[in-house]
A protein has these predicted regions:
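Catalytic Zn2+-binding segment of zinc metalloproteases
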Residues: 2-13, 19-34, 64
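Short amphipathic alpha-helical coupling elements at transmembrane boundaries
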Residues: 14-15, 54
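Short helix/loop segments within enzyme catalytic domains
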Residues: 28, 35-94
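Pan-zinc metallopeptidase signature
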Residues: 83-166
């Protein structure tokens, strides 16, 4: 497969961990019960991608590797065509203005996904080996990620939901 040729072993571990996350969280089940054409469904899908990215990070154990894997899978470009300076990329995330995303997209922008992984990697539980995350830690983390998601994509999408306008 092209994906196997594109990624090194550690990057592939991120992708495998991400996909296992979808399975463990039961993400495929929501498609059965939800209108897949709705804005709400797409917001939920974007949140599920971020949750699964966390398991991908736990699988590869490296923020740099996780971000490289995402950059490669989003662009389809290999190492020879990409210059990886993950630190510079992360610094640019603070300078990025609001990046619009199609409200029908099921995946958050790479900016939101990378910021979410950065926030997750800064969590004390992750740095202790990712064995025990308190619900308070995860709630704080989720609130921070929600701010980013609202700024870059979900906020404008929510405004199109009729119930949100009342």
């Amino acid at each position: 497969s092209a994906l196997i040729d594109l990624l090194d072993d550690n990057e592939f571990m991120f992708v495998v961990g991400h996909e296992i996350g979808h399975f463990l969280f039961g993400h495929g089940l929501a498609r059965i019960e939800t209108n897949s054409d709705s804005v709400e469904f797409n917001i939920q899908q974007r949140a599920q991608e971020i949750s699964s990215d966390r398991l991908g990070l736990l699988g590869c154990q490296s923020l740099d590797v996780a971000i490289r894997a995402m950059m490669k899978t989003v662009s389809g470009l290999s190492d020879e065509h990409l210059r990886f300076d993950v630190g510079a990329f992360l610094r640019q995330l603070d300078e990025v203005p609001q990046v619009g995303i199609n409200s029908a997209s099921t995946h958050p922008s790479i900016f939101v996904r990378c910021r979410a992984l950065l926030w997750f990697s800064l969590n004390d539980a992750y740095n202790r080996g990712g064995d025990k995350f308190s619900s308070d830690d995860l709630l704080r983390l989720d609130r921070q990620i929600q701010k980013d998601a609202d700024k870059f994509s979900d906020g404008p999408a929510r405004e199109t939901i009729p119930e949100a306008q009342e």
